[in-house]
Amino acid sequence: MICIKQIYSKNSKSCYELDLISFNHWNLHQWENELEKDYITAIAIYFKTSILGVCVFHKIFDELEIRYLSVHPSYKRRGLGKKLIHEIIKDNKNDKVKRIFLEVSAENKQALSFYEYFGFETISIRKKYYKDGSDALLKEKMLNK
């Protein structure tokens, strides 16, 4: 059975292991620090006891920023990422969140297509932002009340 639950610093190792095979974005220490922050919310999509996907975000007033979103490579294109985004939108519409921001590499075509599906639009470009020289796209989605 698939379910979505909030996760905490005790889940850092599982998040790190998922990250290693997905992005290799954050090290274990960064995961521990991120999930210990009071202003950070993290949710995971589980199958039984295994984490298949993670989304880390924070809210400031009427804005929400997605800091990390990943699904296990073996479970991509099965709607799990969509479930995480739908959960964030559903849970935060009532909290007066008006818009959602995120940053994504201009080279990550799969992610760009995914975010386009949800209506995210590019509002800014950070030229040669990543180590590989690729641009970062700042994306925004307005939530209609």
Q: Where is each model-derived feature located?
A:
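Active-site acidic-Proline motif in GNAT/NAT acetyltransferases
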Residues: 72-78, 106-108
